[in-house]
Swiss-Prot record:
Pathway connected to this protein: Amino-acid biosynthesis; L-methionine biosynthesis via salvage pathway; L-methionine from S-methyl-5-thio-alpha-D-ribose 1-phosphate: step 5/6
Binding positions (Fe(2+)): H81, H83, E87, H126
Main location: cytoplasm
Subcellular location: Cytoplasm; Nucleus
Organism (species): Ajellomyces capsulatus (strain G186AR / H82 / ATCC MYA-2454 / RMSCC 2432) (Darling's disease fungus)
Reaction(s) the record says it catalyses: 1,2-dihydroxy-5-(methylsulfanyl)pent-1-en-3-one + O2 = 4-methylsulfanyl-2-oxobutanoate + formate + 2 H(+); 1,2-dihydroxy-5-(methylsulfanyl)pent-1-en-3-one + O2 = 3-(methylsulfanyl)propanoate + CO + formate + 2 H(+)
Descriptive protein name: Acireductone dioxygenase
Domain of life from the UniProt record: Eukaryota
Record-listed Ni(2+) binding positions: H81, H83, E87, H126
Main enzyme class: oxidoreductase
Cofactor stoichiometry and binding remark: Binds either 1 Fe or Ni cation per monomer. Iron-binding promotes an acireductone dioxygenase reaction producing 2-keto-4-methylthiobutyrate, while nickel-binding promotes an acireductone dioxygenase reaction producing 3-(methylsulfanyl)propanoate.
């Protein structure tokens, strides 16, 4: 895992966009993002048991696996959105980037590779993309039935209860 401030330079979203300013895991924790390196699946199983994740599946994001819909899917994943549930991803193979909003609404880019696990809290604005190799195999973990429902960022979404709870827990409490 490598986290840093996104450079905001226009261009291919799959490039690193590394500003050279690093972000450490302790900052990620303050915005509710949990990171773990899990070299063995047993560590993922332990975390799943401890956090009550009952279901899982795997997804391969690549042109070979997804065919003609690959580019559209990657663009869709890169639209800024939130979920009303935690988003848990364990990288089985390949690499990708999660971008998450900071306390000041700036992008923090998190590069994940094989063995990296990330938990994004419900209500955090984020987006995802593969890197320039266009391949990632990820395990998705779920507390209940598998679902992935993105709510794209819009002004009215700030009234969403999951967003409000996130802001109260991770943004407002740290600036008071």
């Amino acid at each position: 895992m490598k986290a840093y401030w996104y450079d905001n330079i226009p261009g291919d979203q799959r490039l690193p966009h590394d500003s050279g300013r690093t972000v450490d895991a302790s900052y990620l924790a303050t915005i509710g993002v949990l990171y773990r390196h899990c070299p063995a699946i047993s560590a993922v199983d332990d975390l799943a048991r401890d956090r009550g994740y009952k279901n899982r599946d795997e997804i391969i994001i690549s042109p070979e696996k997804m065919g003609d819909v690959y580019e559209d899917k990657v663009r869709m994943f890169f639209n800024e959105h939130l979920h009303e549930d935690e988003e848990i991803r364990y990288i089985v193979d390949g690499e990708g980037f999660f971008d998450v909003r900071s306390k000041d609404d700036e992008w923090v880019r998190i590069r994940l590779g094989k063995g990296d696990l990330i938990v994004l809290p419900a209500g955090i604005y984020h987006r995802f993309t593969t890197d320039e190799n266009n391949y990632v195999k990820a395990m998705r973990l779920f507390q209940d039935e598998p679902k992935w429902t993105p709510l794209n960022r819009a002004p009215e979404l700030d009234a969403n209860q999951h967003r409000k709870t996130y802001v109260e827990s991770h943004i407002s409490s740290s600036t008071a």
